[in-house]
From Swiss-Prot:
Keywords: ATP-binding, Chaperone, Metal-binding, Nucleotide-binding, Zinc. Component of the ClpX-ClpP complex. Forms a hexameric ring that, in the presence of ATP, binds to fourteen ClpP subunits assembled into a disk-like structure with a central cavity, resembling the structure of eukaryotic proteasomes. Gene3D superfamilies: 1.10.8.60, ClpX chaperone, C4-type zinc finger domain, P-loop containing nucleotide triphosphate hydrolases. Belongs to the ClpX chaperone family. One of its GO terms (biological process) is proteolysis involved in protein catabolic process. Residues 1-54 form the ClpX-type ZB domain. The gene is clpX. ATP-dependent specificity component of the Clp protease. It directs the protease to specific substrates. Can perform chaperone functions in the absence of ClpP. Zn(2+) binds at C13, C16, C35, C38. The keyword Nucleotide-binding applies. GO terms for cellular component: HslUV protease complex. This is ATP-dependent Clp protease ATP-binding subunit ClpX. Transmembrane segments: none annotated. It comes from the Bacteria.
Amino acid sequence: MARAGEGADLLKCSFCGKSQKQVKKLIAGPGVYICDECIDLCNEIIEEELAEATEIGLVDLPRPKEIFAHLEQYIIGQDSAKKSLSVAVYNHYKRIQARESGTGLGEDGVEIAKSNVLLIGPTGTGKTYLAQTLAKMLNVPFAIADATALTEAGYVGEDVENILLKLIQAADFDTKKAETGIIYIDEVDKIARKAENPSITRDVSGEGVQQALLKIIEGTQASVPPQGGRKHPHQEFIQIDTTNVLFIVAGAFAGLDDIIATRSRRRGVGFNAPLHDADEEDLFSQVRPEDLQKYGLIPEFIGRLPVVATVTKLDQEALVRILTEPKNALVRQYQRMFEIDGVELEFTDDAIESVADQALLRGTGARGLRAILEEVLMPVMFDVPGRDDVERVVITREVVLENVNPTLVPREAPSRRTPREKSA
């Protein structure tokens, strides 16, 4: 037993040797003692080792087919985009691990460049959700930014460095962790320059923002103000290297299909060669850098986004599947909420189809499904939790379209107990 020489009753830490008078707390074990300072040190060591263990390792990095299979569980359709993103994400993190292990440069000195992603498709088709699901699967920090809020330095609006601050915040200000995160920039089509030909007038929310984004997307050592907002002298900055940050930039690119169609016609056989009747999504899949440049993206910006993936509009069948099939399908979420109150929630097939039809009618796609369900279920979600006589709520087509009251199936005995009460 560790004891100090001053007196038989004075104990000391078996690890650092400090006496009980030199520390705040001394905890006894079978023949040993440990002080609060050594406990804190042990906790720091464990946290560091756990942080290293949670980093993506080359052995543990899921292969493209595994990433695709995971996306399949949560995202309906969009197979082409899921495949493109699965490959892009795998190659990106494989490149990071190769650099960290010293194998990034082969014997011939070839260095693998970063491949950021451009995601094209209509609103409400799952672009943001694709990126979120990938980041969650890989356990990396994830930040979403809106390109329309950005302006070039010196003008009212957000600096591009504020995007990096969001990523740092998502990583709990652990910059090392943030440096391998994913940033999703939405509405990037809105920062296309206003005219195809460069103008002498300032385009502070268009070409100027594209120029400002170039460096951080390509990879640079950026200085980020910890409080956000504009930079000013004499303030402290957080330094972050964006070399290994994966950027996924996305937009609806309304009108891009017309540019692609015109280019395809021009290269067809004959003066007025008719273009085959092609859907918008088919045209998007044929996009080329020259089309994006004509749309208003500058060549340098296009060059930083070598991987182009496209998502398609969702039809009624796809929206019905989104409502019912994924692991966290919206219908299942609401059924679970009612189940907590001891009530069964049932949707008829035509009710679900009607919800999908409403989303198509509003032009909101998958993004609007939750809002429609909230509108339909709000009255019953308000009323049923206060009643003990309801066993099941049935939502029909008429409830969705005609705003009639849902069918409330009474229970045999008015003694409902929630799952929490049953386990008590």
